[in-house]
Amino acid sequence: MAKDIEISASESKFILEALRQNYRLDGRSFDQFRDVEITFGKEFGDVSVKMGNTKVHCRISCQIAQPYEDRPFEGLFVISTEISPMAGSQFENGNITGEDEVLCSRIIEKSVRRSGALDVEGLCIVAGSKCWAVRADVHFLDCDGGFIDASCIAVMAGLMHFKKPDITVHGEQIIVHPVNEREPVPLGILHIPICVTFSFFNPQDTEENIKGETNSEISIIDATLKEELLRDGVLTVTLNKNREVVQVSKAGGLPMDALTLMKCCHEAYSIIEKITDQILQLLKEDSEKRNKYAAMLTSENAREI
């Protein structure tokens, strides 16, 4: 994600030596995920996610469109990612490589869209003619590693928070009701995939399988930006609370055996379970807050009448 950043030899040596002695610069253990802060905006589908110094914003929107000819009973779902120049000095002056956005967008798309997390059949209005087109716009605001994990959390939280306008169909006429007239309708979410990224280090500079004969390779969860710059391999796994492996992405680096992959999936599950529960709890609190505000507004209007 940040190939153009240079890190000094002394700092690189210090970080790797700390890892050899089971220490990380931010004080976390190797299997510890950063605390995730999820904030919902005033509008449905407006979500900000903060992991350490990494900040991601996601905005879910929808409009009526025409479905694909080969999928007349399904709606449309598109994910768009954009790295803002304010995300870090490495992205200033338009120095944003297409590979960064494509890699992140591809993994998020496999994790969310292709896994069927969103019920696209529920977006159909008139088969073969009209459907809802849902769009997730992800903006990276601050970069300190973990972009993929943070953006996946933001997209799923946004989809679960978003509500589309209610509609009435009379023949070929479609009436879209304003939110202040009719209660908007939530999207159909079939499961909640969450990404967890593992970074691998080879301090001995000897190429072999991860956890090979010397057993010297180091693996950590949720690397910071500086740790990402020094890693020798990376693995992103996506699971849901049902213990289903949604996708596995490994873009080169140190070779890996099946046992290590199984171990990573097992470690990721406890993190995914915690984040899923956190999203559900925050959604519940946000719904209660909105209902309370709506009740107060209704009572005030009744008094005025």
Curated annotation (Swiss-Prot):
GO cellular component, one term: cytoplasmic exosome (RNase complex)
A molecular function GO annotation: mRNA 3'-UTR AU-rich region binding
Single GO biological process annotation from the record: RNA catabolic process
Coiled coil: none
The organism's place on the tree of life at top rank: Eukaryota
Localization per Swiss-Prot or TrEMBL: Cytoplasm; Nucleus, Nucleolus
Record-linked InterPro entries: ExoRNase_PH_dom1, ExoRNase_PH_dom2, ExoRNase_PH_dom2_sf, Exosome_comp_Rrp42_subfam, PNPase/RNase_PH_dom_sf, Ribosomal_Su5_D2-typ_SF, Rrp45
Signal peptide start-end: none
Entry keyword set: Cytoplasm, Exosome, Nucleus, RNA-binding, rRNA processing
SUPFAM superfamilies to which the protein is assigned, alphabetical: Ribonuclease PH domain 2-like, Ribosomal protein S5 domain 2-like
KW Nucleus (keyword) present: yes
Extra facts: Present with 4800 molecules/cell in log phase SD medium.
UniProt similarity note: Belongs to the RNase PH family.
Assembly: Component of the RNA exosome complex. Specifically part of the catalytically inactive RNA exosome core complex (Exo-9) which may associate with the catalytic subunits RRP6 and DIS3 in cytoplasmic- and nuclear-specific RNA exosome complex forms. Exo-9 is formed by a hexameric base ring of RNase PH domain-containing subunits and a cap ring consisting of CSL4, RRP4 and RRP40. Interacts with LRP1.
Family annotation (PANTHER family): EXOSOME COMPLEX COMPONENT RRP45 (PTHR11097:SF14), EXOSOME COMPLEX EXONUCLEASE RIBOSOMAL RNA PROCESSING PROTEIN (PTHR11097)
Role of this protein: Non-catalytic component of the RNA exosome complex which has 3'->5' exoribonuclease activity and participates in a multitude of cellular RNA processing and degradation events. In the nucleus, the RNA exosome complex is involved in proper maturation of stable RNA species such as rRNA, snRNA and snoRNA, in the elimination of RNA processing by-products and non-coding 'pervasive' transcripts, such as antisense RNA species and cryptic unstable transcripts (CUTs), and of mRNAs with processing defects, thereby limiting or excluding their export to the cytoplasm.
Protein name: Exosome complex component RRP45
Organism (species): Saccharomyces cerevisiae (strain ATCC 204508 / S288c) (Baker's yeast)
Gene, per the UniProt record: RRP45
